[in-house]
Amino acid sequence: MKQIMLHGVNDWRLDEIDDPVPGPRDALVRISACGICGTDVSYVHMGMTPGHPIPLGHEMAGVVEWVGAEVTCASVGDRVVVCPSDAGDGPMGTGGAQGGLTPLLFVPEAANGRRLFKVPDGMDLVTAALAEPLAVGMQSVNQSEAKPGDKVVVFGCGPIGLFAIATLQDRGVDDIVAIDFSHARLELAKEMGAAHVLDPSRDDVWAELKRIHGEAPFMFGPTPATDVYIEASGADSVIGDVPVSYT
């Protein structure tokens, strides 16, 4: 069986691996789609291996091909997404023993009910493979505790930022400012529900935020009256700019 494996810096290979031998608590999923995450790219460029090759791929969807006797959350033929979290052998695709860039994925401990989730009827499996990055965007909103009426800024309109915007909109948060350098991504942000978009290459971000969200008093001077910032750009400058703008 084939599997994309990372061997070192910029050294990924399509390796032949042993066929999986599942047990009564495990499952096998025939992979239909697996996304390539920014994390995968970072792993490849940095050669992030624990001293031995590791499989890649953690955004996957497919069809259940086999289930062990103790697995009750899914049946053969079900269309599912696979949760890549650690089930005892490391997180899938980011250092663990399994990875989604393979035709047939071994899913250990599927019997715990937290590994396989059925895909709704009418949703194609390519779309379903976006469940993992969607979950990351949703969790950022969960952690922010943003609520209707809050003024929210989302830095970065890649997949995670866009899913955060979609989640905010779904939860009744309308005053959303999206920030990115890409015109195409800002257009997508508006489609997802952003009320305002800013491009740092042309806009004075902090001045514009004061204009859009109003000003709040602070001991060292007025700041944007923004309630929640969600950082999804990965840019070091943003991490520094937010506290600086409040001092």
State where each predicted segment sits.
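Glycine-rich beta-strand-centered segment in the early N-terminal region that forms part
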Residues: 19-34, 45-86, 111, 120-122
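NAD(P)H dinucleotide-binding glycine-rich loop of Rossmann-like/cofactor-binding domains
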Residues: 86-155
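Hydrophobic/small residue at the entry helix of a nucleotide-binding pocket
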Residues: 160
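Adenosine-nucleotide cofactor-binding segment
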Residues: 121, 154, 169-239
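Residue-level marker of beta-strand positions
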Residues: 59-61, 78-79, 104, 139, ...
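Generic hydrophobic/aromatic pocket-lining and core-packing "Φ" positions
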Residues: 40, 165, 186, 239-243
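Conserved small/polar residues in nucleotide/adenosyl-binding loops
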Residues: 246-247
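Short Gly/Pro-enriched turn/cap motifs at secondary-structure boundaries
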Residues: 7, 18-19, 51-58, 93-97, ...
